[in-house]
Each structure stands twice: as structure tokens, then as C-alpha cells.
Amino acid sequence: MKWPVRSGLVPPLADGFVARPESAPGLAEVLTPGTAVALTPARAASAAIAPGAPDWRGIVGKTQVAAKFAESLWQSRDIDLLVWVNASSRVSILSAYASAATVAMGTDPAGDAEAVAARFVSWLSETSRPWLVVLDDLSAGQDVDGLWPAGPTGRTLVTTTELPASLGQEHLAVFPLSGLSRRESLTYLLGRLTEDRGQRTGAIDLADVLGGEPVALWQASAVLDSSVMSCRDYLDQYARKRDLLAASIPGRPAATAITWTLCVEHASGLLPSGPVQPMLILAAVLDGHSIPGTIFTTAAARDYAGRAAHGLTRPEDAWWCVTTLRRAGLVTIDETCTPPTVRMHPALQAAVRSASSGDVPERAALAAADALLEAWPAEDGGAGLADSLRSCAASIMRLVGDRLWAGNGYQILFRTGQSLQDAHLTMLAAAHWNHVAAASERFLGAEHADSLAAGDRLAESFLAAGRAMEALPWFRKVLSNRISMLGPEHAATIEFEMRMGRALLAAGGAEEAVTLLERMVSERGQLNGAAHPETLDARDALADAYCAAGRMREGIRMYQRTSTERARAQGQYHAATLATCQKLADAYLVANRIKDSLAAYKQVATGRERTLGPHHPSTIEIHSRLAMAYQSAGRLATAVQLHERARSDSERILGVDHVDTLTRQVYLAHAYYAVGRIGDAVSLLRDTAQRCDLVLSPGHPLTQSVRESLANIAGG
């Protein structure tokens, strides 16, 4: 692995970005290795904000200051790891940590995201490499429960409008941030207005009036930059708009509350045919931290926005609307991403929704659901894109809730659930499907095809989360509905029964699984024939059940028969044939048929080496199992050689901190102990224990197993 590495998308600095030595001095002196700092607005809350209303008080440029700090550390090579996290939800934090673990630790991205995140946090606490983790827009303390990044070589930077009470100052220092100073504001304005110096007339007065509000300065400069008016002309428009707002709302309106309305008027002038405002409302109902640009060019988005513009027939026309919003200072676009990422400040989103009449935001959200579903690729397309899509879906759900079920919009719930499962966010996926399954039965009826699908997904997500006992009632319920609707001999019913058999095994119901799977084998054979792959799969599952029920002889006979028929029907080196043969070898070993076990493992090893290569993870796994069989046979020297080979290959292919590598290191230590190399065994176990403490949670089974082995071999 080449260091330094980074994970997550750091928002690009705004056009004309200026350093803030007066309004944000000393952050580098406060945020040193081993510390954590929260960037918060310096302005105290003066009044409660109504639900859904824009809160302009927190717009002090927190994210931009954090981005500048992060990039400065990166450019100066003061850190080896930079992790940028959209911390607006626990889902996003887990997803970001899982991606960072893959980059920094070489962790298998297929692992459970909660477990991977816990290992990453543990790694941060112990690594000698300097790191920075930015938690951008953290709003709920419970979102970082068990996920707080800390360590002697690391820095944690949080941006938040209001510091969650559960964090408090024992976790981090508060760095209050105000708006730009007068000098900084003027520097920014003059830096943006370089093409026509005549536009600078009145710049000092405009900087004073805007009061250092970063977004107001950005929006005003965007309007000026895409027009011919001067700062003095803009001030005249600003004053008129301020007077209108002052007459309709209590108190003095914030500068940004005025500038954004001027931006909307300017955008409409840049593209007067009508689609700009509908496209703006679409952006306002999605997650403003990161909106995949492809959403705006979908047919659903074009249809919605085009109703005000006699149709938007081409994707490039829709994208032109979005770039117009950028020119007017309403959104930013990061075109270094694929697809381009559109960002919109949450307070501005709330203002747009609040200013929209009647059910316009709801209709926009329902249209956005269709557009999001259309833009969502069949494969999630990377952790960052997947998280952005899920976050946009969550924004829609918060806005319209159960109204998604009135039409076809609820399909976005199903796509989100699938994405959670694909990202191995197992606990969150189970909670999501629990909600979707209940809502689907309520709105569509228990026998609707989508209700059956939701129940199916819930059962599988419970199973994936290790909650087999909770999965079983749903397996039974869905199976009952399938039988009543499709019949007991329908292929979909039989396939579901097969999965239920595996769920019974996971829940400890081995005998019930045997009964079910014996019938399944018979039905599959009658339906498809004895040599059909689905029949052979059912036999494999039945053999698993026999072994789990302690009926090893029957299990071995079934594996033998299936292995022979797979070799004849699918080929000796087919992946499924080798998988069955490996199960047979495992069963032989449990039954103490060591000679048979060795022969079967050798056959699998030959097949894996031939089809996958000698260094594939599956080949390394079978070498490790073969070594254990040799050890059981008393051929200790051969066992040690194979264990050493498996450990070495695993380190090279998977990395020294991968859980499989650590497991093989434990196997090697036990082999050393068996041949009397006590010192080597103890040394290896101590090294493994240190690595487990570094990359695994304290309660991880491997961590506990290593500690027990050390206690037994070395006396502690």
C-alpha cells in the first residue's frame, strides 16, 4: 500500500476562496495530534426556529474552513490519512468508515459495515500514522455512538450548527466561527470581480451590508459575475428586497435571506423560459450535501421541470438549467466527480421549500423519487455514489413519508433497502425492511407481490444480521402466502423453502430443517431431474442439515453422492463441485476419517490451483484446511510447512491485518506448539494479540480466542 491515502470527497473550495486569518485564526494551533475540535457558529441562538424554516444563523462557512484545513494538511504531508465524512446520518458515517477501512487497512469491503467501522475506529486509536477525520455537518450525537475517532496521532474535526449535548467538551474543544471580517469580505468580493473593474463600484458598502455572511457574499458575487451590474446597482436591488421582506417577517432579515431571493430572480432572467425554478425545487428536496447530477437529467426530472417550459426533451437542456443555478449562486457543482456532484446549502433548501406554495414541495419530492429511481444504477457504483443516492432517498422520505405509497414512489424504498444490503449495513437494512414490510402490508395488502417481496427481504436481512430467530416468523409468513398464491409446486415457492431450510439451520432448528429439506430434495428431483443444479443445491443443503443434527453418516453419504453427480453434470473443476467436495472433506475431518479428509482436501486444492491460481483467497483457504488435516493425521512437519505457506500467502494477498490472515497466524502458532516450538508459538500469539487489539473489537471472537491460547500456552 502506498501512503498517504485519502477517502471521501472533500468539497472543493469556493471560487475566489480567501484565507480567514481574522475570522478563523489559530485552528492549526488548536487542532493538534491527539485532539478534536468542533467548528460551530459563534452567534448564539436568539430564537427558536420553526420546523422546516431556514436557519440562517449557522451559515458561517464551517465546511469551507474545514475543507481548507484538510487540504492544507494533505498538501504539506502532515497526515498519512485524510477521511472526509458526511456526518448527517449514521448510515453515511458507517458507509464512509467502511470505505476508509478498505483504503487504509485493506479491509474486505464485503464485511459487515458495523464491524468494519468498529475495527477502523480501533485502528485509528492505535496506528502510528498521522491522520485527520472530518465529520461534516454532525447533528445527532447518537450517530457517532461507538464510532468516535480518537488516537494519539490523529485529529478529529467536526462541523456542526449546534454541538450535540451528548458530545460535550470532554470529547472536543469548541472553536466558535463567525462570518468573514470586513477586510476578508472585501478581499473576496474584489477577487471575484476581476473582469470589469467598474463592477467594483460600491464594493466596500456591499461588503459592510452583507455582514460577512459567506453564502450571502458568494451569492451576491455570483449574480454580479454573471451580469453587468455594479456593486452599487446590486445594493439598490438588495435594499428594495430587504424592505419587502422586513414588511412580511418579524425582525431584521439575515443577509442570506435576501440574497437568495435575488439569485432566484437572476436565474430566471438568465433562462427565462421557465424550467429554472422547478429544477431548483427538485434540488431543494434532495440531500444538499451530495446530489448525483444524473438525477437532474433523467426523463422524470425533465418531465417535472419541463411542465413550466413546454418540455425539456434533451438531458443537456436539463443540465443547462442546473448550471444556470450555479451561475446564479444557488448551487455548486463539483465536476471532478463521476457523475458530477451538485451541492446546495441546507438552509437555502429549507428557504426554497418554505417559499414554495401549497403542495409544490411534496409534488417535487414525488417527482424526485421517480428521478432518483431512474438514476440509480443496477450496481451501486461505488460507496460514495451509493451513500449519496441513499441520502437523497432519505431526504425524500422525511418530506413525504407515507405519501410515497399513494403512487409508485414507494419503489425508492425497495431500492434503498437493496442498497443497504449491498453495502453490508445489515442492522440498518433490517430496520429499514421492518418498516417497509409493515407499511407495504398496510397500504398494498398482505398478498400484494411487493408485500411478499418486502417480507422476503426482511427475512433475509434479519438472517444476515445474525437474528435468525426473528427471521423465522417472516420466512414462515412469506412461505404461507407464496403457497396460497402460487401453489406448493411453483418454482418460486420451492426456491423460498430452500432458503427457509438454511434459516432453520442458522436458528438451531436442524431436525426441522432436515424434514423440510428432505421434502425439498424430492420435489426438486421430480420437478427438475436428479442432476439439475437446483436439485444438487438442495442436496447440499440437506447434507448440511444432517451434519448439524449430528447425523454425520447420512451427511457424508449425501455429500459423496452430490459430489459425484456434480462432477458428472458440471465438471470435476466446476466451482460448485469443488465447494461440495470441500464440505465433504470438512465432514470427514469432523468424523475423524482423516485419510479420506486428506484425499478430499487435496482434490479441492488441485482444482482451486488449476481454476483460480495458487494465490487466490479461496486457494489459500483450502491450503489452510489441508494443513489442519495433516495436523490431525499427526504429520506435523508437513502441517507446519502448509500453515506457513497459507499465512505468508494471506499476508501478501489480503494484508497483515486481515482477519483471515490473523486466523491463519493462530493456526500456525498452534502447529508450532504441537512440534515443541513453544517460543515461536508464544511470540506469534503475542504478535497476533497486538494486531487483533489494533484492528478488531475487544469482544471479537478471534481476539478472545487468541487471549485464551496465550493464557494456556504461556500462562498469560
Task: Walk through the language-model features, giving the residues of each.
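Aliphatic-rich helical/repeat scaffold segments used for oligomerization and domain docking
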Residues: 1-438, 442, 453-457, 465-480, ...
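Intrinsic-disorder-linked linear interaction elements in eukaryotic regulatory proteins
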Residues: 293, 298-302, 317-323, 337, ...
